[in-house]
């Protein structure tokens, strides 16, 4: 028998899971999402991607600023949910909320726990050079991503993969995984395993101060840095354009052969020397402009070999 669920999520990453659970036939009693925020040129208030999808399907949407009040708890309990599904909600759940659903609260997390607990697991996995990532369904407890694990799926991280690529792959995998987990819960067959205390790492929130590219690092580290921050906040450097140093985000790159002083442009294809080896820029973005392929950019704004990028 399908479950009665409360769904809690905010960004695009959570949308496939909401849609998959609804398509399976579960009763989505309510959707909780973060409050609307100003966005766009007019800075008008906009609901989150999850809230917009829920409204499209006529599912009640709640956007409380806190879940710690008696009123918020009473409202949450009023949904009489079998379970809550939490995907990138963006708010810590108090113990009283965790205890409210009959079968508990289940979180979809974008890492292979206990590695990369915390806010930015996708970015940190790429930036650290991890060979793989994945998604896990865990039963939530009061800790930070410390709950018992129910199911997991793994995916290889390639050199060409950006956070966007990993995000989209894990969002699809995660939706299927949560459907399977809720089906097992529905049949009282969901098995839980305690997380290991070994290999725990924390994925700190990305700070914009991390975004500047340091070409004095090894080429592989520079590539991972760029792809781990693409598209947001975007790893940046300053290109010499018309006699000025212009800040540009590099969104995609590839390993390249060649050597020179760190930051030196080695050819007319925007191959840049690093501490050892080089990278070739594939996609970049100037402030206020749309992303461009490097060859298209260079046709209008050539960067000569020998130039130095800082």
UniProtKB/Swiss-Prot annotation:
GO molecular function terms noted in the UniProt entry: methionyl-tRNA formyltransferase activity
Principal EC category: transferase
GO CC terms on record?
cytosol
Write down the superkingdom of origin. Answer: Bacteria
Q: Which PROSITE patterns match?
A: GART
CDD domains (alphabetical): FMT_core_Met-tRNA-FMT_N, Met_tRNA_FMT_C
Record keywords, A-Z: Protein biosynthesis, Transferase
A Pfam family the protein falls into: Formyl_trans_C
Recorded hits in InterPro entries, A to Z, give: Fmt (IPR005794), Formyl_trans_C (IPR005793), Formyl_transf_N (IPR002376), Formyl_transf_N_sf (IPR036477), Formyl_transferase-like_C_sf (IPR011034), GART_AS (IPR001555), Met-tRNA-FMT_C (IPR044135), Met-tRNA-FMT_N (IPR041711)
Residues that coordinate or bind (6S)-5,6,7,8-tetrahydrofolate: 111-114
What catalytic activity is recorded?
A: L-methionyl-tRNA(fMet) + (6R)-10-formyltetrahydrofolate = N-formyl-L-methionyl-tRNA(fMet) + (6S)-5,6,7,8-tetrahydrofolate + H(+)
**What role does it play?**
Attaches a formyl group to the free amino group of methionyl-tRNA(fMet). The formyl group appears to play a dual role in the initiator identity of N-formylmethionyl-tRNA by promoting its recognition by IF2 and preventing the misappropriation of this tRNA by the elongation apparatus.
PANTHER family recorded for this chain? METHIONYL-TRNA FORMYLTRANSFERASE (PTHR11138), METHIONYL-TRNA FORMYLTRANSFERASE, MITOCHONDRIAL (PTHR11138:SF5)
What protein does this entry describe?
A: Methionyl-tRNA formyltransferase
Q: What is the lineage of its organism?
A: Bacteria, Pseudomonadati, Pseudomonadota, Alphaproteobacteria, Hyphomicrobiales
């Amino acid at each position: 028998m399908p479950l009665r669920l409360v769904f809690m999520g905010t960004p695009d990453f959570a949308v496939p899971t909401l849609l998959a659970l609804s398509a399976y036939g579960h009763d989505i009693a309510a959707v909780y999402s973060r409050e609307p925020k100003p966005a766009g040129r007019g800075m008008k208030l906009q609901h989150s991607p999850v809230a917009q999808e829920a409204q499209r399907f006529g599912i009640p949407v709640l956007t409380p600023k806190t879940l710690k009040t008696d009123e918020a708890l009473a409202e949450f309990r009023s949904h009489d949910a079998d379970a809550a599904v939490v995907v990138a909600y963006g708010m810590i759940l108090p113990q009283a909320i965790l205890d409210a659903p009959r079968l508990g609260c289940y979180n979809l997390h974008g890492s292979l726990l206990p590695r990369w607990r915390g806010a930015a697991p996708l970015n940190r996995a790429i930036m650290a050079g991890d060979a793989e990532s994945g998604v896990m369904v865990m039963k939530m407890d009061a800790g930070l991503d410390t709950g018992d694990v129910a199911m997991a799926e793994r995916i290889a991280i390639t050199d060409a993969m950006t956070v966007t690529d990993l995000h989209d792959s894990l969002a699809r995998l995660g939706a299927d995984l949560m459907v399977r987990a809720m089906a097992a819960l529905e049949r009282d067959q969901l098995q839980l395993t305690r997380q290991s205390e070994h290999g725990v790492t924390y994925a700190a929130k990305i700070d914009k101060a991390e975004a500047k590219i340091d070409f004095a690092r090894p080429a592989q580290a520079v590539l991972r840095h760029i792809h781990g921050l693409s598209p947001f906040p975007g790893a940046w450097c300053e290109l010499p354009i018309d006699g000025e140093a212009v800040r540009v985000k590099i969104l995609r790159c590839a390993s390249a052969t060649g050597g020179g002083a760190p930051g030196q442009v080695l050819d007319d294809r925007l191959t840049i020397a690093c501490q050892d080896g080089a990278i070739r820029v594939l996609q970049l973005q100037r402030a206020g402009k749309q992303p461009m392929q490097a060859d298209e950019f260079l046709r209008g704004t050539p960067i000569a070999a020998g130039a130095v990028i800082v």
